[in-house]
Amino acid sequence: MDAWKEITKTTENDGVSTCSLSSIAFDPYSELVWTGHKNGQIKSSFGPSLTSYTQFIGHEGPVHQVLPQERGVFSLSSKSLRLSNRKGTIRWRYQDSDCIDYRAMFYQSRNNPEVVIGGYHQKLTVVNAERGISIHKDKNVSDIFIMRRNRLLCCGSTNGEIILRDPNSFQPVNKVVAHTGTISDIDTSGNLLLSCGYSLRHGTYMLDPFVKVWDLRNLSSLVPIPFPAGPTIIRMHPKLSTTAVVCSCSGQFHIVDTGNPLDAKLMQIPLTSYLTGMDIASTGDAMVFTDVEDNIHLWSPLENPSFSDLKLPIQLPNTSTETVQLENNDPLNSIGLPYYKDELLSSWSKYLIFDVGKPILDSNLLIAKQISENSHPVPQEIKSFHRNQIIEVPWLNRKLISEGATPKFHSERQKDIMSGNDIEGSASYFEEIEDTISGPDSIPKFYQRPVIKYSKFGIEDFDFGFYNKTKYAGLETDITNSYCNSVLQLLSYVPSFSKAAISHSLGPCDLMECLLCELGFLFAMLKESTGRNCQATNFLRAFSNSSFAQSLGIVFDDYSDGTFPDSFVIQKFTKFMLTEISRIADYEDKKDGTSFPVSFLLKSFCIPEMQTYRCGICGITSQKIKSSLYIIDLHYPSQQLESILSFEWLFKMSLDRRVDLPPGWCEYCLAHQPFLLRSFIRSLPDCLFINTQVKHHEHWKLWARKNWLPKKLHLRRVNDTMQCVSQKISNLDKDQQSLSVYVLRGIIYEIRQNGEEPHFVSTIRVSDNTSSDNPDDNRWYIFNDFLVKEVTEEEALTVHGPWKIPIIVYYEKLDTKIPQWDEVSDYTLLYQPYSLNKNPPINKIQPLTTDEMLYPKMLVGIDSEFVALQQEETEVRSDGTKSTIKPSKLSLARVSVLRGEGPNKGLPFIDDYVATDDKVTDYLTEYSGIHPGDLDPDRSPYNVVPLKVAYKKLRLLVNAGCIFVGHGLQKDFRIINLLVPPEQVVDTVDLFFLSSRQRKLSLKFLAWYLLDEEIQLTEHDSIEDALTALKLYDCYDKLKSQGKLEETLDNIYEVGRRFKFRPPSVASMSLEDRNSYGDESVISNQTN
């Protein structure tokens, strides 16, 4: 408040008469200041410079009050009420022959907007604001000098009384005797009523040296505000509900808090006369004063203040445009373009050029062709070319990147590269495709649902990298309930959430279906992926099995019943996840040794809420209930949504809600009385999740406003509740340390495309430093499943059209500090057996001993077996070709890990069969070696463990830096949902592979050719396959050290081609077959 200063001073004096200004008011809907004059003129000035905008004659006599509203500008004189538009054109005029002298008016917007007027004629009149006719009159009322509207209509009179009237019936409810003389001014804010006026002292009416303050709830008098200079004008601050501006006629004014009247800031307007009027802009950024000499003084703490929050555009007069002189050397960018709404032709994509076909031939030429079969009609434009000239047809050689382009499969791209047919100009990344600009009806492709295509080689052949050239991972969609991807992506970039989940997943946890552990595993993959696509298979499987989630209706079974997730399902899922964390925290509290990461995580988003029930008659609060929220729902008023000025106001109302309840029993009144339920937030955590609750188009229109969603939220605690203030108001707050600043970090949107089910995307500000102003630390990305793309901040925050609906908003407290704790991995599972079996299982392993500590680059052999939960879905086209609609759904059934070095090399230390509650459609026994009953802990003779245990063992090996040796590990790790860094994978299918042959060799064939071993004779055994992979790796090292690797690879493919890459029995090979490749056996030639 100390920074207030005069920034503009203008005069309305015409040089003939003085004291012509009679009223002044800011326009709450546009950047205008309105003034009324004693000669009936009404003027408006634009902007901080107070440039003249409009001027017109409104009345025959003095203009007592000007009241700008959305419908226009109301002006009141002694005999008439007029409504004009902002250009000065009259809409209607109201006059009453019985009126003596109108003095005050007030606009109230109900179902039918009305203007209430009063004056010195003992009559209160209500005029319809649309038609300008009287709809209600009250006679025999006291004189009304000034009116203010709050919960009650406050009418000040010349006898010192303030009559409080019901705003609906306009009947007197109560009255306050404020002064013994006339009232000078009154104003209201919230439950406060302030007045200043005259009192009789020593036989003379003198200004009271203080401002009187009342509480309208019980009409009790509060501590008055001292003002020795004598108050004549009072205005309550429109943003600070307890702050008042008190002015004297000498030009002094105080800015004072009614709760602390002694702490006032005194300022002086440089006047040579007396002050006659003042007003405060609805933004609170400017004040305007008028004096007897018709000067207008504009005060503000800003150099360029704003008068209106809405800033509706004003219509400027038409001006003739000058002819633009353009010379050859003049730059084109010096010539401006006219305003346009539609897209310019120059910005159309070159791919919007279409072939319209050949020109229409003349009918006479067609008749001529019928007469002579040897003649052919030729268009006249072609006849104009000579025979040695070439007609250029641009579309023949044009190479387009189709707007609906999809990436080529890896196999197709590799084939094109090998054959030299790779098309020049084909897109390597999604961002290279020509795309549209976001608009009310145009949906760019990066918002549309990306679709996975399948080839005969399965999903591994799909090029996910086409949709993501960033270092941040996307999530795949071919999984049941993958609608959760947008929420999972947002949570992964909440630092406290990600760190606590990963730490929890590494430690001991007894819950076998722990969603926090699954989140930790997923977040670790997303963190380490460096842009590779990931999938939330294990998390979504555990989520789908949750009975609590099923009861909430947020688990879907491949949408088989025709229902699809919508925005409210996403909001329910988010609330479910935060509630689930609370449940896990309660479980940890009951155990010995509470897990600090979980308790810290709960505090980071848990919101304490208080609910009170107050009797509407006796006013006694009868019950207080404390509860916890995890996400805040926005609550919109049922009517007059257009009156919501900002997101901060809406959020403030949602933090402190009041609801009228039906009558209940009051213990103090001993009767059934109406109750008021109040729900308010006492404090806010570091992580703030907000449900937008956009339920219909009127709600959406608020979010479509420009700059509706603030990048920062400023909150402070007032008494017992949290309040949200705008940034401008927060800058005026004297106690900056009491403010909490929250930074916008992410938004989840629902994308609606015509004819398709909705899907969800998240826009996230990916940054490790929320307080940084460095642009590199404030980059926004859109996560649309496996499509990830950097976007501008404007693109991320703007709601372009009805197809883009905000669902969840996430704010993070500025400078949030996450405590450091040791992320200690629990390796107990690797050293101690774990089993679900009721009977002791067959022991095929020797667990690691304390002497066999894991270390980086330690070799381990691995192989996995899988069962099918869902068969492949295919379709046969009319040409006989078959395409995959959906691949088979596989689940981990067995995993074996062997020591790859040391004295116990080849000895397994993990051989787990994985229990599953899902229905197995095919055990794939021929390829997996799994039989019915092997995965049932009650019947299986083998060691059966939960999926979480098997997965965590592998995760621990990855974290320890072990190198996995196996055959076809890419597909195995994908189904297991385990991300292993490439440097920790040795895949024998790639070691013995020639890209020029375009065929990868089976483990069975390589073992026959290189090791002289026959494996997989009956069924697959993961221990045998893992051991074989270790031997092949040793063979590879030996061949490479001898310099025979390339020669051996060529021979392998030659032999494979002869035997169709199927190993025959060595004993059954004829002598001719053996000798055709040398004097010695085929195998011995390669191994010696």
Swiss-Prot record:
Q: How is the cofactor bound?
A: Binds 2 metal cations per subunit in the catalytic exonuclease domain.
- Output one GO MF annotation: nucleic acid binding
Q: Which residue ranges does the record assign to the Exonuclease domain? A: 860-1033
Q: Which cofactor does it need?
A: a divalent metal cation
> Which keywords appear in this protein's UniProt record, sorted alphabetically?
Cytoplasm, Exonuclease, Hydrolase, Metal-binding, mRNA processing, Nuclease, Repeat, WD repeat
Stretches forming WD repeats: 16-56, 136-175, 178-224, 270-309
Q: How is its activity regulated?
A: Positively regulated by the regulatory subunit ppk26/pan3.
Q: Which CDD domains match?
A: PAN2_exo (cd06143), Peptidase_C19P (cd02672)
Locate the USP domain: which residues?
443-814
InterPro entries cross-referenced by the UniProt entry: Exonuclease_RNaseT/DNA_pol3, PAN2, PAN2-PAN3_catalytic_subunit, PAN2_N, PAN2_UCH_dom, Papain-like_cys_pep_sf, RNaseH-like_sf, RNaseH_sf
Alphabetical list of PROSITE patterns matching this protein = USP_3
Q: Where is this region: Linker?
A: 309-443
The residues the record assigns to binding a divalent metal cation are D863, E865, D972, D1025
Q: Which Pfam families match?
A: PAN2_N (PF20770), RNase_T (PF00929), UCH_1 (PF13423)
Where does the record place it? Cytoplasm
The entry describes its oligomerization and partners as:
Forms a heterotrimer with an asymmetric homodimer of the regulatory subunit ppk26/pan3 to form the poly(A)-nuclease (PAN) deadenylation complex.
Q: Which family does it belong to?
A: Belongs to the peptidase C19 family. PAN2 subfamily.
Write down what this protein is called.
PAN2-PAN3 deadenylation complex catalytic subunit pan2
Source organism per entry reads Schizosaccharomyces pombe (strain 972 / ATCC 24843) (Fission yeast)
